[in-house]
Each structure stands twice: as C-alpha cells, then as structure tokens.
C-alpha cells in the first residue's frame, strides 16, 4: 500500500508541475487483478475514477458489471468503468461491439445502467499509439448515419460525464480478481 500511495503522490506532483493538471483517473489497462485496498488509496490521493480492461478475460466466472462503484475494504467507493471495446473506430467494428452484432455479442453488459463506451484506440503493447488511419477513421465516423455517435474527449471528462448519466449502477465490494492469471498480485493462489 505504501508504495502505491507514493506512486500516486509523486505522479500527481509530476503532472501538476509539468502538465498543469491533476489527474482524477487511475487507469490500469494491463494488470492481472486489483487489491480491495485500491479504492481507499485512490480517494486518499484525490483520484475518483478507476478504469481497466482485463476483467473481461475471466475464464471461470464472468464478471457481472462494466460500469459500477467499486467498494474497498473500508467502505470507500470509486466509480469504475471496464473498457471492453477494443477496436479501431471503424463503423463495422463499432457496430459489432456496441450493438452486439459480433461473435462475442455486445460489449455493453448492462444497458439499463448506461449505453456509453470509451473507445480507446492505437497500438499499446509496444508503443506506437494511434496511427493516422485510426485518427482519420474516427473523424469520419463521428456523425456517420447508422453508426453510433462518437466524439473525442479526455478520460477524466468521459468518466465525469458517465458518472452523471448512469442509472442505478451496482456496487461491487472487494478484490477484483482476474481468474485467467490466477494468483498474480493477489491473496488467492488457486
């Protein structure tokens, strides 16, 4: 816990000094499970929102939520969003993920809570970021008839807007355990 608090504090100090802002988001896209102490640490460091992607990889129990409040050990809650949409901003990919037309169905688990999705794009596992084609395609589909409405935003603004728009989000208490990579950074060994 102490190491994580230091990382938050030094990270916030760095972004304030060199970029002029304080982040309100904790985004861990490629991590194999999350301690139930994280919400308390986040709130203590003025970080309100948590985002990740891999919880959809569970191989035994499907995690029930993608937009919810995560409650830590001490009862502290942080608003959480799982980005289950991994695609370019191409019209057919967006339709598959958002409207459930692909082999895996919709990337939205609880439409009664929200129908909004953060679509992050670019090459991540090796750097590279977004390519010109991805940015251009995103621009072109922004108002394309028959495609879901898209727009550019910051992660912090997306999360703030999402929290204001959700309807009756669930609360999940405890560790976020990723079954696919059992025992990594958790207290569960089997």
Please report, for each region that a protein language model flagged, where it lies by residue.
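Catalytic-domain carbohydrate-binding cleft regions of carbohydrate-active enzymes
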Residues: 1-190
């Amino acid at each position: 816990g102490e190491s994580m608090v230091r990382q938050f504090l030094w990270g916030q100090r760095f972004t304030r000094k060199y970029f002029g802002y304080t982040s309100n988001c904790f985004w861990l896209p490629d991590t194999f499970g999350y301690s139930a102490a994280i919400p308390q640490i986040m709130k203590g460091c003025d970080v309100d929102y948590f985002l990740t992607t891999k919880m959809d990889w569970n191989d035994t129990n499907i995690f029930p939520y993608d937009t919810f409040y995560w409650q830590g050990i001490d009862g502290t809650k942080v608003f959480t969003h799982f980005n289950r949409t991994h695609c370019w901003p191409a019209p057919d990919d967006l339709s598959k993920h958002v409207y459930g037309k692909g082999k895996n169905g919709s990337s939205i688990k609880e439409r009664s809570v929200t129908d909004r999705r953060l679509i992050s794009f670019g090459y991540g596992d090796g750097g590279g970021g977004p390519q010109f084609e991805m940015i251009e395609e995103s621009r072109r589909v922004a108002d394309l008839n028959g495609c879901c409405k898209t727009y550019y935003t910051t992660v912090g603004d997306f999360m703030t807007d999402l929290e204001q728009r959700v309807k009756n989000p669930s609360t999940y208490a405890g560790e976020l355990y990723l079954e696919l990579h059992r025992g990594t950074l958790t207290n569960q060994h089997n």
